Amino acid sequence: PLYSSAASDVYKRQDISIITNIELDHEKWLGSTLEQIGLQKAAILKQGKIGILGSDSMPLSVTSKSKEICKKTLQLGKEFRVSSQNNKWSYSIPHKNFELEDIDSGNLNHESAACALSAYKMLLEDDIDFKKVIEATHLPGRCHSIEHFILDVSHNPASVKNLIQFLDRNHKDIKFNAIFSAMSDKDCESIINEISQYISEWNICSIEDTRFNISELINITEHITNKSVVKHDSVYSAVERSYHEKVPCIVFGSFITVSQAYQAIEKIKKENHEDH
């Protein structure tokens, strides 16, 4: 109750609402079309406040709602812009006469970072080194590199595309083993199809969740790819094997998978340190 009260209070006092993008996910609760999901997400927009939209192809249910109730709407591709080339990206918000160029990509999603920049520029005029701040910002669980592992909580086709963009920028022409577990209510076929060409071996891990079915996931993976598929009774088992083999490895598919992989890596590193 205390958390709910605090969260509700923050919502009531917010000056800016940000909707980064709309993709098919959590259809059971949000709806089966982008317009339906957009309508649900648009509920965070506040009357008389600022709405920031982080996609140039937002559903009409979002853009129309924002224009209807927000005092100002900023949308990617219109009121602020992003461009990228190689390992750099640039940002501009013309009506504020502000732009940044040649920002190191890091592991941040460019569009989401641009939303945060736009929000800051709408609230404050502080003269700070934005480029330095952005390049020093790191999100755990998003394209996070630890030794020869890349951990990413991507669990739908859209977020996997962001992971692929990161791989193309930073690890071009490298093949990875995958440590992968995704819930049965996700679009597993599309997820696997998107990233399959980057994967040499699939390690499918069992996780304790009523939405998870390892036999079904293995069948889908074997049907889509012609790569080796290895079954593990835990994320720890897959991480331990990959850790000692020192093969480049991507961990993705769910928050649970990545969380357990973080724990496994830390435990194995600690054990190895104690042995030496």
Regions found by a protein language model. Give the residues of each.
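Cofactor-binding loop segments of dinucleotide-utilizing enzymes, especially the Rossmann-like FAD-
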Residues: 21, 56, 180-184, 206-207, ...
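Short, flexible loop segments at boundaries between secondary-structure elements
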Residues: 271-276
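C-terminal helical cap/extension that packs against the catalytic core
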Residues: 56-70, 85-87, 192-248
